[in-house]
C-alpha cells in the first residue's frame, strides 16, 4: 500500500490537530460542572458517560495522521488509568497543553531534544514536590472525600466506599455487581483474592476489562498437573455441561494439550471454563487450596486423600456466587453458606500462629487468616435505566481506584490547585538550575500544568486565567471550588486528589508530549 509522508512542522501540526479534537471531547467532563458525553454503540442503547478513558477509547478519526495524534494522547490516558485508575481526563488535558506550548517554541527554532530534557527534569522536580506536600490518609472522612470527588461529587458513593474500606481493610477486595432495584447498597460477604490470574487470555469473557466473570460457578480444586482432558477431566466436564454452569479450575498447572482442549470447549460454547494455576509452592500450595475449599464448600482432589480426577462427582466441587479473573488475580465471592466452617478454619490457623517456629511461617499464616476472614465488599449498583447503571458503575470504579491510590501515596489539594501552585515553584527552581533550551522545556511544563484548573473554571462558566491568577496568589492549600464558585482551603472543602493520580497523570503527559515534540516525520497509509 502507498504511504503518505509528512515532515517537520507539518507532521507535528497534524498530530496536534488530532489531539485537539480528542481533548475537546474529553475535557468537557472535567470538574464538578463538567458535562456528559453520549457514545453511540453498534448494538444496544447509546451510553452516557463522564469518564475520560472511556470517551478516549471511542474516538476514531477519518484522517489517518490526525488519528495518530488521537492514539498517542489516548496512551497518556490509558497508562494513567492502568497505574492510578483515575485522572485520565487530567492527563489528557495536560498532554495537549504541553504539546501546544511546546510547538510554539519548536517552530521558533528551539532544540526539541534540549526541550525534552528540560521537560523531564521539570517533571522530576514536580514529582518530588507532590510527594512532599502529600498528606497521609488516616481517617474515614478523607477517604469519603476522595471517593466523592472521583465519583463526580456524589457523596452517597463516597460514604459507601468509605464504609466498604472500613469493613474489609485497605487491602480488602471491593466488587461491583448490577443490583436488582434502584438503590445502590453495600454487602459484606465471604470471599478471597488469589494472586494468580488466568493461564490463557482465550478464557476472557469481557474484552473491555480484559477479565473473566462468571456467576454461580463450580470450582474444581486439585494439586495435580492436568495433562490430558480426555483422561483427567472428561467425566466431570460431562456432568458440569448438563448443569449449564461455568467452571473455575484451580490446578498445579495445565499442560498445553489440555489447555488447548479446554479453550476449544469454551470457544465452541460447550462449557464455560477458566483455568488458573494454584497459588503458593509446595506444602503452602496444598494449605491454600484447603483454605479455598473451606470458603467454597468443596474438596481438594489430591492423592493424599485417595481421590483421583477420573472418578469424582459434582458434590466434591466447590461453589461461589461469582468469580472475577484477570491476568494477575482471581477473586472468589462466596455464597454465604460456609460462615461457620470459615470461622473454625481461622481459629485453627490462629492456633498454628502461636506455635509457629519462624517469622516467615507466622507471616504466611497471618496472610492466610487475613485472606479468609477479610471478606469481600460487594456494592450492588442500583439505577432506573441501563444507561444510568453503566454510568454509575464507571463512576464507582473511578472512585474505588482513586481511594486506593489515596491510601497508597496520600492526598493533595484538588481541583487543579496543586499543579497551579507548583507552577510558580517550578519557575523559580528552573531559573536557578536550568539554562537555554532546557529552561524553555521547564517553562513549557510550568505554563501547561495550569490547564486543568483553567478547564475546570471554564466548564463552570468562569474566566479561567483570572481564577489561575487568584489561586496562585494564595497559600498552597487554597484553591477554587467550582461547585460553589468560591475560593477556600481545599482540605476543609473536601476537594482533594490522590497524590498518585496527580503524579502519574503528569508523568504520562510529559512522556507523550516530549515524544511528539521530538517527532520529525510521520509515515501513514495513503487513503483513496
Swiss-Prot record:
One of its GO terms (cellular component) is chloroplast. Gene3D superfamilies: GroEL, GroEL-like equatorial domain, TCP-1-like chaperonin intermediate domain. It is an enzyme of class 5 (isomerase). Coiled coil: none annotated. It catalyses: ATP + H2O + a folded polypeptide = ADP + phosphate + an unfolded polypeptide. Pfam families: Cpn60_TCP1. ATP binds at residues 29-32, 86-90, 415, 481-483, 497. One of its GO terms (molecular function) is ATP binding. It is found in: Plastid, Chloroplast. Its EC number is 5.6.1.7. It comes from the Eukaryota. Keywords: ATP-binding, Chaperone, Chloroplast, Isomerase, Nucleotide-binding, Plastid. One of its GO terms (biological process) is protein refolding. Forms a cylinder of 14 subunits composed of two heptameric rings stacked back-to-back. Interacts with the co-chaperonin GroES. PANTHER family: 60 KDA HEAT SHOCK PROTEIN, MITOCHONDRIAL. Together with its co-chaperonin GroES, plays an essential role in assisting protein folding. The GroEL-GroES system forms a nano-cage that allows encapsulation of the non-native substrate proteins and provides a physical environment optimized to promote and accelerate protein folding. Belongs to the chaperonin (HSP60) family. This is Chaperonin GroEL, chloroplastic. It comes from Trieres chinensis (Marine centric diatom). The gene is groEL.
Amino acid at each position: 500500500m502507498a504511504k503518505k509522508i509528512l515532515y517537520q512542522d507539518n507532521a507535528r501540526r497534524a498530530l496536534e490537530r488530532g489531539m485537539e479534537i480528542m481533548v475537546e471531547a474529553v475535557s468537557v467532563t472535567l470538574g464538578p460542572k463538567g458535562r456528559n458525553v453520549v457514545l453511540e454503540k453498534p448494538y444496544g442503547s447509546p451510553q452516557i458517560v463522564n469518564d475520560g478513558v472511556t470517551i478516549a477509547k471511542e474516538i476514531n478519526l477519518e484522517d489517518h495522521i490526525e488519528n495518530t495524534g488521537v492514539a498517542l494522547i489516548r496512551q497518556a490516558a490509558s497508562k494513567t488509568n492502568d497505574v492510578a485508575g483515575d485522572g485520565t481526563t487530567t492527563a489528557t488535558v495536560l498532554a495537549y497543553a504541553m504539546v501546544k506550548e511546546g510547538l510554539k517554541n519548536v517552530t521558533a527554532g528551539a532544540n526539541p531534544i534540549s526541550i525534552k530534557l528540560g521537560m523531564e527534569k521539570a517533571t522530576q522536580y514536580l514529582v518530588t514536590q507532590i510527594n512532599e506536600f502529600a498528606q497521609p490518609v488516616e481517617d474515614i472522612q478523607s477517604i469519603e472525600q476522595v471517593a466523592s470527588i472521583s465519583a463526580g461529587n456524589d457523596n452517597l458513593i463516597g460514604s459507601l466506599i468509605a464504609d466498604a474500606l472500613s469493613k474489609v481493610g485497605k487491602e480488602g477486595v471491593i466488587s461491583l455487581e448490577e443490583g436488582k432495584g434502584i438503590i445502590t447498597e453495600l454487602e459484606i460477604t465471604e470471599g478471597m483474592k488469589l494472586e494468580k490470574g488466568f493461564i490463557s487470555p482465550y478464557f476472557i469473557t469481557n474484552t473491555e476489562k480484559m477479565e473473566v466473570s462468571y456467576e454461580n460457578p463450580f470450582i474444581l480444586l486439585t494439586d495435580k498437573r492436568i495433562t490430558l482432558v480426555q483422561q483427567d477431566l472428561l467425566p466431570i466436564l460431562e456432568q458440569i455441561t448438563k448443569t449449564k454452569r461455568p467452571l473455575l479450575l484451580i490446578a498445579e498447572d495445565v499442560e498445553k494439550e489440555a489447555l488447548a482442549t479446554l479453550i476449544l470447549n469454551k470457544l465452541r460454547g460447550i462449557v464455560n471454563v477458566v483455568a488458573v494455576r494454584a497459588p503458593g509452592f509446595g506444602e503452602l500450595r496444598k494449605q491454600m487450596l484447603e483454605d479455598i475449599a473451606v470458603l467454597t464448600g468443596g474438596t481438594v482432589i489430591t492423592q493424599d486423600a485417595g481421590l483421583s480426577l477420573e472418578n469424582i462427582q459434582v458434590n466434591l466441587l466447590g461453589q461461589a456466587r461469582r468469580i472475577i479473573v484477570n491476568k494477575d488475580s482471581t477473586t472468589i465471592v462466596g455464597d454465604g453458606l460456609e460462615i461457620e466452617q470459615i470461622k473454625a478454619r481461622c481459629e485453627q490457623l490462629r492456633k498454628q500462629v502461636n506455635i509457629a517456629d519462624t517469622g516467615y511461617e507466622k507471616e504466611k499464616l497471618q496472610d492466610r487468616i487475613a485472606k479468609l476472614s477479610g471478606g469481600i465488599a460487594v456494592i450492588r449498583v442500583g439505577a432506573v435505566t441501563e444507561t444510568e447503571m453503566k454510568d454509575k458503575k464507571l463512576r464507582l470504579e473511578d472512585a474505588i481506584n482513586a481511594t486506593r491510590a489515596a491510601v497508597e501515596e496520600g492526598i493533595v489539594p484538588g481541583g487543579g490547585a496543586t499543579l497551579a501552585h507548583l507552577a510558580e515553584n517550578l519557575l523559580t527552581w528552573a531559573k536557578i538550575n536550568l539554562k537555554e533550551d532546557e529552561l524553555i522545556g521547564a517553562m513549557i511544563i510550568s505554563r501547561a500544568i495550569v490547564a486543568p484548573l483553567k478547564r475546570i473554571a471554564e466548564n463552570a462558566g468562569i474566566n479561567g486565567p483570572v481564577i489561575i491568577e487568584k489561586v496562585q496568589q494564595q497559600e498552597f492549600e487554597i484553591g477554587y471550588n467550582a461547585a460553589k464558585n468560591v475560593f477556600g482551603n481545599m482540605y476543609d472543602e473536601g476537594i482533594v486528589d490522590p497524590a498518585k493520580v496527580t503524579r502519574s497523570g503528569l508523568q504520562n503527559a510529559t512522556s507523550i508530549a516530549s515524544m511528539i515534540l521530538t517527532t520529525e516525520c510521520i509515515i501513514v497509509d495513503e487513503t483513496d
